[in-house]
Amino acid sequence: MPVARSSKAQSSKQPRASKAPSVTENVPPEKEEGCQAKRSPSSPQGGPKKRSAFGDITNAHKNQVVTGKKEGVKAPTRKATRAPPAPIVAKNNEINLKKSLRKTPPADVPVEPEKDSVPEEPVQQVPVVEDIDKEQLGDPYANAEYAKEIFDYMREREEKFLLPDYMEKQSDISRDMRAILVDWMVEVQENFELNHETLYLAVKLVDHYLVEVVSMRDKLQLIGSTAVLIASKFEERCPPCVDDFLYICDDAYKREELIAMETSILRTLNFDINIPIPYRFLRRFAKCARASMETLTLARFVCEMTLQEYDYARERPSKLAASSLLLALTMKNLGGWTPTLEYYSGYCAQDLHPLVKRLNFLLTYQPCDKLKAVRTKYSHRVFFEVAKTTPMDMMKLEEKLKS
């Protein structure tokens, strides 16, 4: 500040200031402050010339003389005009930016079409499908990388193995005889502790063989036991031997007859015995639903009850499995058909409702009370006693399916 300068400096430079008193009056205050801030006594250039508090007047006098001579070339106020500091410029730019944002857009620029170009409602309504194979990626025993392709291939093979109504041409075999045979095959599977896939495949082999061959009733048990033998070789790690199947038939057939029937079945089916079965789809769909073992077992019970019923033999295995799981979920009050189940099964809930009602009717009114192998099997503690679960009331079932 000019006040901080000593009085000594003022007295030493007083004669020079008196030489041009008129100039001192003409210098504006901004000029003085600018010149004072421009050069300080401590600067290298201000060393030789000691100036007083008004020492800039001499320079101002000189500047006025020069500007008087070169008035047309240089503007007199050019040196006094200074650019605002950087913080002030930034602040002004920020204020101008806010003002420009507050301005309303021109009338000719459409604003609403931008909302129409990106609709929000469809994006919110996209169903979330869970990747159920993500957790098992890299597991060589799970083959998660090919799981979807495998089941898509099985869905394609369903078309090839759809059963016609073959009972019309079987003169010596009835639906009740078939039901008795399947009930006996369930006991064989349980006694030998075979996989469920073995039982389902054996029933499929019997049905497809009877489509092509007209058989007599005295050979029906031989066909069933041989079908279990073939299915065991296809599904089991350690299948039972031929003598075991002769024993369960109470030695009603000879070894040569069993081997001859095995050859006949394989040749009749052209050795194409990889038939899609409901149980494989059921395990897949239960994984999609994150169902517990108890819920899966209830769905197994529902699905296995259909094996001895001829009317369900012509249903698609994937649809039968999906309907059994949906009925089990409804009976347990665990929700309905999720987008993940719809994606992996290929069926929406409305496609399954008629079959679900039929399955619930089957649990409520069993056609033959003498065939209790499946109910006895699933009444055990190992299977959570799911056979004792009370079937749903038909009216309540319809209400839950509609909701």
Curated annotation (Swiss-Prot):
Q: Which PANTHER family match?
A: CYCLINS
Q: To which protein family does this belong?
A: Belongs to the cyclin family. Cyclin AB subfamily.
Tell me which UniProt keywords the record has, alphabetically: Cell cycle, Cell division, Cyclin, Nucleus, Ubl conjugation
Q: Does the keyword Glycosyltransferase apply?
A: no
Pfam families given in the database record: Cyclin_C, Cyclin_N
Q: Which GO terms describe its biological process?
A: cell division; G1/S transition of mitotic cell cycle
List, alphabetically, the InterPro entries matched.
Cyclin (IPR039361), Cyclin-like_dom (IPR013763), Cyclin-like_sf (IPR036915), Cyclin_A/B-like (IPR046965), Cyclin_C-dom (IPR004367), Cyclin_N (IPR006671), Cyclins_cyclin-box (IPR048258)
Record's GO cellular component terms = cyclin-dependent protein kinase holoenzyme complex; cytoplasm; nucleus
User: Any notes on this protein's domains?
Assistant: The N-terminal destruction box (D-box) probably acts as a recognition signal for degradation via the ubiquitin-proteasome pathway.
Give start-end positions of Polar residues composition bias.
Answer: 7-25
Highest taxon listed in the record's lineage: Eukaryota
The cross-references to SUPFAM superfamilies, in alphabetical order and at most eight, read: Cyclin-like
Q: How does it assemble?
A: Interacts with the CDK1 and CDK2 protein kinases.
PROSITE patterns named in the record: CYCLINS
The record's subcellular locations are: Nucleus
Q: Which organism is it from?
A: Gallus gallus
List the protein's name: G2/mitotic-specific cyclin-B3
Q: What does this protein do?
A: Cyclins are positive regulatory subunits of the cyclin-dependent kinases (CDKs), and thereby play an essential role in the control of the cell cycle, notably via their destruction during cell division. Could be involved at the G2/M (mitosis or meiosis) transition. G2/M cyclins accumulate steadily during G2 and are abruptly destroyed at mitosis.
MF GO annotations:
cyclin-dependent protein serine/threonine kinase regulator activity
